[in-house]
């Protein structure tokens, strides 16, 4: 159903999905606020002793390797094991893959554990698939269009959904390719918007897991929600500081009509 993604925000707000975030220290507060704004419940449970059990009761799990330590690597591995055992959808955000050997090895092992979704920029997705070297730090040096093959490779390997963010977002799963035009350039000037999107994606997958909304459409909805909110925020703010606040407000206030009017979605046959 072409517009099924429009129904997903209502489910998120109605169910308040619990999202376990194993994410980087730079973005933790912003990520938690973004989840609260969309109607989800954040939990930053990342220690090895607790992450397995918590992944079993969470509705969704985010694995983000932005600022990893030895303890967090262990916690992420345990959370993946717990999510897999419980059938909890988990999202892999491969921050900085390609440039650092230990991080890249961990992230590539994680791919083989079948995340429900992978979300990254074009250079991260290309590097994760083994088709490129990665970007410049956490910034992409590849265009989204250059990552189509890599996204399809990863979707086949995991059986899940792969999202590539950029000026136009790409969402790929086995048999489907969607292009989503939304967002605003100001999003790139606020640290943590991409990382928060990974958490929002986990919330959407958790809220829609036992519904007739396909995981592909849930991932589209997550990206549409943040992108539309980004556009609204740009009309209310003139600089990055005020934009960050306006973005949280817009995430909370977004309604179905705004989502439909501020999102341009097209499906492509490949």
UniProtKB/Swiss-Prot annotation:
The keyword Repeat does not apply. One of its GO terms (molecular function) is magnesium ion binding. ATP binds at residues 119, 165. It catalyses: 5-(2-hydroxyethyl)-4-methylthiazole + ATP = 4-methyl-5-(2-phosphooxyethyl)-thiazole + ADP + H(+). Its cofactor is Mg(2+). InterPro entries: Hyethyz_kinase (IPR000417), Ribokinase-like (IPR029056). Substrate binds at residues 44, 192. Keywords: ATP-binding, Kinase, Magnesium, Metal-binding, Nucleotide-binding, Thiamine biosynthesis, Transferase. Pathway: Cofactor biosynthesis; thiamine diphosphate biosynthesis; 4-methyl-5-(2-phosphoethyl)-thiazole from 5-(2-hydroxyethyl)-4-methylthiazole: step 1/1. Its EC number is 2.7.1.50. The keyword Magnesium applies. It comes from the Bacteria. SUPFAM superfamilies: Ribokinase-like. GO terms for biological process: thiamine biosynthetic process; thiamine diphosphate biosynthetic process. Belongs to the Thz kinase family. Catalyzes the phosphorylation of the hydroxyl group of 4-methyl-5-beta-hydroxyethylthiazole (THZ). This is Hydroxyethylthiazole kinase.
């Amino acid at each position: 159903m072409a517009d099924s993604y429009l129904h997903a925000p209502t489910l998120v707000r109605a169910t308040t999905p619990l999202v376990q975030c194993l994410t980087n220290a730079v973005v933790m507060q912003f990520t938690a606020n973004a989840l609260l704004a969309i109607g989800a419940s954040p939990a930053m449970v990342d220690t090895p002793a607790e992450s397995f059990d918590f992944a079993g009761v969470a509705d969704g799990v985010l694995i983000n390797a932005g600022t990893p330590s030895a303890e967090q690597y262990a916690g992420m591995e345990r959370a993946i094991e717990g999510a897999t055992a419980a059938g909890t959808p988990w999202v892999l955000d491969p921050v900085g893959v390609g440039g650092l050997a230990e991080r890249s090895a961990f992230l590539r092992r994680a791919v083989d554990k079948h995340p429900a979704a992978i979300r990254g920029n074009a250079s991260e997705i290309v590097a994760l698939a083994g088709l490129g070297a990665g970007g410049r730090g956490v910034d992409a040096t590849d265009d989204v269009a250059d990552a189509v093959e890599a996204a399809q490779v990863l979707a086949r390997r995991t059986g899940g959904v792969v999202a590539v963010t950029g000026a136009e977002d790409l969402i790929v799963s086995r048999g489907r390719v969607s292009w989503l035009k939304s967002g605003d350039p100001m999003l790139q000037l606020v640290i943590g918007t991409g990382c928060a999107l990974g958490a929002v994606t986990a919330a959407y997958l958790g809220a829609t897991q036992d519904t007739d909304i396909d995981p592909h459409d849930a991932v589209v909805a997550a990206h549409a929600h943040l992108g539309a909110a980004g556009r609204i925020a740009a009309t209310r703010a003139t600089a990055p500081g005020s934009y960050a606040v306006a973005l949280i407000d817009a995430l909370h206030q977004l309604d179905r009509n705004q989502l439909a009017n501020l999102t341009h979605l097209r499906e492509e046959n490949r």
